[in-house]
Amino acid sequence: MLVGTPNLLTLDEADATWTLIKDKVIEEHFGPNAVAVPFLSDAACYDLLGVLVKQSRPAHTRLALPGRQGRRALKPVGPLPSLLEQAGSEGAFAHCTREYSPNGRAERAYEETRMLDGQPCKIRLHMGDLRKKVAFLLLPPGQVSLQQTLPWLRSTHSIYVIYQVFSCSWLQLGLTSTAREPQLLRLLRSLPVAFSCLKFSLQSKGVLGPQKPLTKDPLPHGANWVRPNLSIMPPLAPTSAPADTTEAADVPPPVPAPPTPPPQEGPEDKPTRFSYKGRNPFWRGPQILSENWLFSPRSPPPGAQGGGPRDPDGHSMSLPLLQGLSSEFDSDD
């Protein structure tokens, strides 16, 4: 337990600790396919439909950094809808989003002891009011184009689109060490903490091509992350007031935080949001997914495949995405 009144951690200081534990935390609670947001201070850049692009290092830098260190980095560049050409893409691109509550307590905790500055330090992380948001996309190849003025377009051959986001409504990170006063960061706002991507090829003039598999792609897992330029990047969501961070001084410091009440039986177990953008991409109706959200990864049933050649909507991203999500949801059929 933290003793006394802890010193407040800044977001930059908390990021230094987050980078030490994020991969282990996210894999333990959300499964191996989820990618941890690289920095808490930039977490809003990794929300639903955010686009990530590869960024090459300068040639002399690549020669000096062999192997993993010389690999291309990923950088968030904004939400997909704001990057599309308005003329020609209207009607071709559509998506709907759905939000799920956990199948149990909407709170997770993690604790680890590490050597920091030569002293053992206990790291405690608590995340509360967890949610999962999923976007179902209709993105027919060859019919949707990116804006020609995007500075990174000429050197980009594929993009990553965030289609699944795990977020929390509050986060608390505490550090306890015998060599220093306890330190604490508590954020009282919605914050993405992990995400999953789809990869799409880019054809000439920024036209989006077909979806590409991620099975042999080393990215986005283990990527070197480039911090976004928040002054020029289109916002993904309204930014929270800075008071959200500084208000932590008025928040009682005990860890863990008050538990989130478990979800009640009844309508509260249903998805809390189901919205369409653009024309309805599911005119046939998708397969029915239950609202059970399991944090531990599960294997798909034997023989489960994506959209096949007999699927008339196989060109779109909606049905393959639904098939890909079958490993995390139980079917009601």
Curated annotation (Swiss-Prot):
Keyword field contains Phosphoprotein: no
Compositional bias (Polar residues): 324-333
Pro residues bias locations: 251-265
Keyword Cell cycle (UniProt): no
Highest taxon, organism lineage: Eukaryota
Pfam families documented for this protein: DUF4663
Location, primary (coarse class): other
Name the record gives this protein: Uncharacterized protein C11orf42
Species assigned in the record: Homo sapiens
